[in-house]
């Protein structure tokens, strides 16, 4: 489907939702809102999540954040028996808005959305959503180099293990626990967590995750995170081998993520002292970053630029550095 047509289809779905044109009954107290409205919000979120990997965040962030506001307006109007489910959906949209903000490089806004998502997840009583949001907050702390909060939040997510039903969500939680252990230099613990995440991802069924929270946490995703963990542990050559293996089989539907992981491979190749390997993946990653407007990918590429300055006398390296530098923004490293 063409980009413009796809965005138009999403807009057509959004326009029939609360806050965007749907004629709802006047707020006469509890029970004033048809509970089926919740299903409509869920369908819209599913469409936005599907669009995210193909289109990037720029075309979606406004629609997602508008739906959070629309949902919040319904909390006082929805009947009591449906309120918990509405809080679930509000938490899902807030988490997704935070994810989009992160991808645009606005980490302050992303963290604010995650805090709101955690509040609503606790209000809903849904442990899958609460664990997932804590995992995401750990990622955000890791993005910003805040090791202690990243580790503590990952451990908080793991403490939900016995309550979480979704295997994909549990896999996502354990792979982030692996990153946390690697940040603390605990190689054995990190690899054990990654093995657990791999087993969960391999065995996961779609019915385990009705809200499609951790559906991205596939076997391929866990494998590419293993490469990132090796890099954090300082084993850059092994990390590069892992990246090369998994990227050969990367799903086409995760186009934006392909760019992100190629950018991370570029950083690893530079740290391993391999400028040609860094250029190979960096050039493709930059093209995808431009196509999908992913600031996270650009941030990773800017990290690689700092490592590649020693090879700037090579014309191809100099050209790459200039191209990445022209993208603006700041350096840094992010996960998901």
What do the PLM-derived regions correspond to, one by one?
Residues 1-35:
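Compositionally biased, long intrinsically disordered regions
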């Amino acid at each position: 489907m063409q980009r413009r047509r796809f965005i138009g289809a999403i807009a057509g779905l959004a326009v029939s939702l609360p806050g965007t044109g749907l004629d709802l009954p006047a707020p006469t107290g509890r029970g004033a809102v048809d509970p089926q409205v919740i299903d409509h919000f869920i369908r819209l979120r599913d469409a936005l999540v599907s669009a995210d990997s193909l289109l990037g965040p720029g075309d979606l962030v406004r629609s997602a954040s508008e739906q959070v506001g629309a949902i919040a307006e319904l909390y006082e109007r929805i009947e009591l028996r449906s309120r918990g489910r509405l809080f679930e959906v509000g938490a899902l949209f807030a988490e997704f808005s935070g994810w989009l903000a992160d991808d645009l490089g606005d980490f302050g806004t992303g963290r604010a959305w995650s805090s709101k998502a955690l509040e609503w997840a606790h209000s809903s009583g849904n442990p899958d959503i609460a664990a997932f949001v804590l995992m995401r907050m750990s990622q955000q702390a890791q993005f910003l180099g805040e090791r202690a909060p990243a580790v503590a939040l990952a451990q908080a997510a793991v403490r939900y293990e016995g309550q979480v039903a979704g295997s994909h969500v549990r896999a996502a939680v354990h792979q982030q626990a692996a990153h946390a252990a690697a940040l603390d230099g605990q190689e054995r613990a990190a690899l054990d967590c990654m093995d657990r995440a791999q087993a969960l991802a391999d065995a996961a069924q779609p019915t385990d995750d009705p809200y499609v929270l951790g559906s991205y946490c596939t076997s391929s995703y866990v494998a590419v995170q293993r490469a990132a963990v090796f890099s954090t542990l300082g084993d850059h050559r092994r990390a590069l081998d892992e990246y090369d293996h998994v990227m050969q089989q990367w799903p086409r539907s995760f186009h934006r993520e392909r760019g992100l992981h190629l950018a991370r491979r570029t950083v690893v190749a530079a740290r391993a002292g391999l400028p040609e390997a860094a250029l190979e993946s960096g050039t493709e990653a930059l093209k995808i970053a431009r196509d999908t407007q992913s600031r996270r990918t650009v941030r990773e590429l800017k990290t690689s630029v700092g490592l590649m300055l020693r090879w700037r006398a090579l014309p191809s390296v100099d050209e790459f550095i200039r191209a990445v530098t022209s993208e603006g923004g700041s350096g840094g490293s992010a996960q998901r």
